Amino acid sequence: VRYAVRASRGLPLRFIVQASSCVPAAPGLELSGADFQADEITELLALPEVAGLAEVMDMRAVLEASPRMMGILAAAIASGKIIEGHARGLSGERLQAYAAAGISADHEIVSGADALEKLRAGLTVELRGSHDYLLPEVVAAIRTLPVVPTSLTVCTDDVFPDYLVEKGGMIDVLRRLIRYGLDPLQAIRCATINNAYRLRRDDLGWVAAGRRADLIVLTDLRELQVEQVYANGRLVASGARMVETLRAPLQALPTRTMKLTELSPADFAVRLPELADGRAVVRAIRGARFTEWSEVEVDVIEGAAVLPPELSLMTVVHRHGRSQLGPQTALIEGWGRWRGAYATSYAHDSHNLVVYGADPVEMALAANTVIRMGGGAAVVRDQQVLASTAFPVAGLLSAAEPMQVAREHRVLVEAAGEVVEWQAPYRTFKALSGQCLACNAGPHLTDLGLTDGSTREILKPFVRLPVSGGERRAG
């Protein structure tokens, strides 16, 4: 975090950073590269570039008033800075309790009704562009209000590099909101003045004397074609080209964060120590993004589950050098049968090494490709690497030029589409980086094993021996 703050200083773009509130996102269910407590948060909030506490994802810890989370929230409140939320699925009394803890915004909007309830609860609602399938419904709900409130803002959330280069970030979200029926001037207001209100920055968001001149010049108010960009009063881009030269990095990049040895096919097995051979009923994770438990009867050979033909495998391996537990593997359902493998070190929110596939040999090849690159993502099919892109900076970022990263990512996504069949809106490439987010309700696989975000349990794959005649049922 300190590196990101230092690296942003002096760039021709204003970076407003927030302190990471949930490292890890689900304590006790996963291990991250560090454990942030109140002391670390206090130190980060003291930095002038840090505007507040980043999204508080551990909703359960807030609602149960866990000492760790109460300490983090108290540090943020004492700093006088804003606290961002992650209130996915919260409603009624639970939403009110979450907001009462000092959290004042949410971007995890799941419907139009959800957006309206959170606005009425006094939260700032941040419409995110990463869930495009929800935006038409949310815009329709907003249009039922007598006015567009100042507490309605806009954000991007995750944006992949090829999309960012081709269509842009915030400007693309605004274009889509306008296309879905939001008045252009209201959309622009949400992204400028309203966002400045949210950040408690009265020096931003206005075209007025005495304010900071972070400005864009548009050729029209519907397609929002950007002609010029000014940052802090300086022209930094014109005609879609930078006019200011970027300086070289001032410090060494944080690399070598893949702290694990190469893996073998034997590491990608669902181990069942309760049974050497025979048949067993085991837990599986059904679905993408919004997951639920299922139970599947499988053959067991030498203490390992035999993969049923309609299921696939998911493996998570701790990569930060803080655990000796080894790879954790689970059956996944609802993804179809993988025809290859995909591995990545970019996996919310602890960003351990995550691998998907059906063939342990191909899964090992994909995983080892990522390990050798020092982080990144790789697609394997027919025991050949179809595509890969390196993220050597913390296993999350590339040091290459944006156009190169965009090209590599596009090839990666196209290759991934050859080994798994996408089914929008949930079974998408984006979902591959979110399946480990154990703070959300339902089952997830982390570096500690099968977890339940609703009950905060870590569960074994083995459920029981089957009844006679075999079975398969939802759990």
Task: State where each predicted segment sits.
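Short, glycine/serine-rich, charged loops/turns that create anion-binding
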Residues: 22, 57, 159, 321, ...
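Active-site microenvironment of metallo-dependent hydrolases
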Residues: 165-181, 185-475
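Short coil/turn segments at beta-strand junctions that form active-site/ligand-binding loops
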Residues: 13, 150, 375
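N-terminal cationic-hydrophobic initiation segments that often serve targeting/anchoring roles
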Residues: 5-9, 45, 143-146, 178, ...
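Residue-level marker for buried hydrophobic side chains located in beta-strands
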Residues: 17, 154, 356-359
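Short, solvent-exposed polar/charged micro-motifs at secondary-structure junctions
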Residues: 25-30, 95-96, 118, 163-164, ...
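Active-site core of metal-dependent hydrolases
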Residues: 51-191, 196-208, 215-220, 225-231, ...
